[in-house]
From Swiss-Prot:
Origin organism lineage: Bacteria, Pseudomonadati, Pseudomonadota, Gammaproteobacteria, Cellvibrionales
Pfam families named among the record's database cross-references: Glu_cys_ligase (PF04262)
Species per Swiss-Prot/TrEMBL record: Saccharophagus degradans (strain 2-40 / ATCC 43961 / DSM 17024)
Chain segments annotated as transmembrane: none
Keyword Calcium found: no
Keywords: ATP-binding, Glutathione biosynthesis, Ligase, Nucleotide-binding
Annotated protein name in UniProt: Glutamate--cysteine ligase
GO cellular-component term (any): cytosol
Catalytic activity: L-cysteine + L-glutamate + ATP = gamma-L-glutamyl-L-cysteine + ADP + phosphate + H(+)
Amino acid sequence: MYEIQSFHAGLYDSKNAPVLTGIMRGIEREGLRIDRDGKLAQTPHPVALGSALTHPQITTDFSEALLEFITPPTHRVEDLFKQLYDIQGYTLSKLDDELIWSSSMPCVLNDDATIPVAQYGSSNNGTMKTVYRVGLGHRYGRAMQTVAGLHYNFSLPDAFWSFLHREEYSLLDLQDFKDQKYFALIRNFRRYYWLLVYLFGASPALCGSFIKGREHNLQPLIDERTLHLPYATSLRMGDLGYQSSAQESLYVCYNDKQSYITTLCAAITTPIDEYKAIGLQDEKGEFKQLNTSLLQIENEFYSSIRPKRTAKHGETALSALRNRGVEYIEVRCLDIDPFDPLGVNKPQVRFLDTFLLYCALQDSPDTSPEESANILRNQKTVVTEGRSPKALIESFTKGKIPLKQAGEALIKAMRPVAELLDIAHETEEHTQSLETQLAAILNPELTPSARIISHLSAKKLPYAHYALAQSRHHHETLLAKKPSNNTMQQFEKMAAESLDKQTRLEQKNSGNFSEFLQEYYKQYQMCCDK
């Protein structure tokens, strides 16, 4: 049902191993800073961590209390995890009496006013980042922005693309060929990422304070402090999590690079009444949002995966993509693993590599608006009832299929890809990762979401108490083996350099913010016009 139709046999040749050993990976892991009682930290971003605006590895997301750790791109999985360990270990050593929340769904929250928006200083770039977040708060509420996730960045080496380019006798320029193939990967990813939500969803329950005053269909677990759905996998990926009902009417086309850019640019440059009503500035002239369009910038579009290109200073992400093509893809549908101190583990990464390479090699027809609607329905099904024995996945070509049957068939189709990666890396870890996840398909009780519900029920623990206990445990685990003195010194140097860089940016600030914003948005108009 999901088998790759035209597998390139030459990939099995040992001399072609560099075609796959050159895969580049990176992780972005978010985590809320909390006090020892499990409440959201009200303190500013610690100076010892450097500038959240300019530090390359430690920054903040929506809230001043929502940390984000960014590993540099690396070829080796072992190096990836050492980097993530070092970043988190250094950070924890500088947090004084605070912890990092272990889960995707947030700690006990009070009203929106107690959720501090991230601050990035007085430069135009820093002001823009803060105003964007203020706008998110007005549009969706600040509570939704405290949800944490894990992003996986992935790129295949030029050697791989050159190999395919030759095998397929393509007449395209290599970058154009890569763009075409990355968008094909993305289309297949969107067809099948329901499997990742099922396997790695780890937010089946949440603290009642998160949805206080909002309509919902969640049920109490033990008591009203913890709400859940019996067969849920990832409430983070559902309507109550990091999603936007306002964007449900937005159809973004993934059939080629220009269509993707054009549809997103239109959403950024077309005002809508709902956001006009918020207003652009308050009575004091302070900005309430960057614009009144459906999207302030491309980052506001909530998607499971993004095509990416590293942007230059002052360049929009879409301009970078238009000018230089796809560099890597960013997987955005992963929950924090509350059972692991780092929020992710090596077998999961091996599985993701296999899944993404499968998506790259599998035939990938264009996606229609009807299939896109089908994809979203599958996401909602797996989010709310993925572990139900009655859960059905909608295949756009084959109709409704039991989730267990679809998952088993997809894993089977991925096996040749896992074997390919094992041969290239001289390991069995990719095949083993498939077998581990196949077991979770056949037995839903092995999934992280089921394990969490089982633990809460058995111990009669509220969600917030459980997540706080995990946070304390992970804190002690990571601090027990601090990074080396040399690594600590490197991070201290990075922090100092980032603070200096922010100061220099603020000193050379030119023009007022309104003019800066006007110039910045001209780039989107150029993207629309092309």
